[in-house]
Curated annotation (Swiss-Prot):
Organism expressing this protein natively: Rhea americana (Greater rhea)
One term under GO cellular component: extracellular region
Superkingdom of the source species: Eukaryota
Record-annotated C-type lectin domain positions: 13-132
UniProt keyword list: Disulfide bond, Extracellular matrix, Lectin, Secreted
Protein name, UniProt field: Rheacalcin-1
Bridged cysteine pairs (disulfide): C6-C17, C34-C131, C106-C123
Coiled-coil intervals: none
GO MF annotation terms: carbohydrate binding
Length: 135
């Protein structure tokens, strides 16, 4: 039996730790919070459908069925393309639709989809957020 390498209340999934935070912050402040809470953390990047499902289930369990806002992830639009704040490559996506609103340049897991689809929100919106770091 190996010890859980993640902070108490965090999800341990395939070598990474995920922490859900209910406080609603604009995207940049949420990213800053992730960096402070534990070294090496960022807003979460999501690279596979398995990782996405695990994160969505974790958020749903944390929320215990409460209605809430979308949840920031570490994806943002810069220089005409989407990038992960942790510098990882984008190989997977789960956009709700491809009709991006003008000026909405940060991505969130959509509450109404059970967090299984992404939508673009104005980065100034205040949302809950999920951080990710290596275990």
């Amino acid at each position: 039996v190996r010890a859980n390498r993640c902070l108490k209340g965090w999800l341990d999934f395939r070598g990474n730790c995920y922490g859900y935070f209910r406080q609603e912050l604009p995207w940049r402040k949420a990213e800053a919070w992730c960096r402070v809470v534990r070294g090496g953390c960022h807003l979460a990047s999501i690279h596979t459908s398995e990782e996405h499902r695990a994160v969505a289930k974790f958020i749903s369990q944390c929320r215990r069925g409460e209605e809430g806002d979308d949840v920031w992830i570490g994806l943002y639009h810069w220089n005409k393309s989407w990038s992960w704040i942790d510098g990882s490559k984008m190989h997977y996506s789960a956009w709700d639709d491809d009709d991006f609103s003008k000026g909405q340049y940060c991505a969130a897991l959509e509450d109404s989809s059970g967090f299984l689809s992404w939508e673009d929100d104005a980065c100034s919106e205040r949302n809950a957020f999920i951080c990710k770091c290596a275990a």
